[in-house]
Design a protein with these regions (language model features):
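Two-component/phosphorelay signaling modules centered on CheY-like receiver
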Residues: 14-35
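Receiver (REC) domain active-site loop signature in two-component systems and cognate sites
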Residues: 62
Length: 130
């Protein structure tokens, strides 16, 4: 299945980016995913691209500008506040979940460690770009 709407995916972990790409291939999905390393790069991307992504995915633990700070900045910005933001992170901490929900995250998912579980993550992102 081909999806033309862009996903901006912020995660500094190369292994996780590989998991995302491999899970997408295993599902036979053609997704337009742009990977960046941190929140600062999210805003650099948004400020330099003509097209706003349909979805932003954030890890919480990133250098320079972490996922919480990035989410807060996005939701306070009139230009970007309506873009759905999904958190995909290693933290299952209830406080992190509550903070992200309060800041406006559309969905909070804990990173898995297998291809089949990563495929479930990808399937949960698709409704935001369909």
């Amino acid at each position: 299945m081909t999806y033309t709407k862009k996903i901006l995916y912020a995660d500094d972990d190369l292994d996780d980016k590989t998991w995302v790409s491999e899970a997408t291939e295993l599902l036979n999905y053609q997704l337009d995913i742009e990977f960046v390393e941190n929140g600062r790069q999210v805003f650099e991307y948004l400020e330099t691209q003509m097209e706003v992504p349909a979805l932003i995915v954030l890890d919480l633990n990133m250098p320079e500008l972490d996922g919480r700070q990035t989410l807060k900045k996005l939701k306070l910005n009139n230009k970007y506040k309506n873009i759905p933001v999904v958190i995909v992170t290693t933290s299952a901490n209830k406080i992190d979940v509550e903070i992200c929900n309060r800041l406006g995250a559309s969905l909070y998912l804990v990173k898995p460690d297998s291809h089949s579980e990563w495929q479930l993550i990808i399937k949960q992102l698709v409704p935001y770009i369909s």
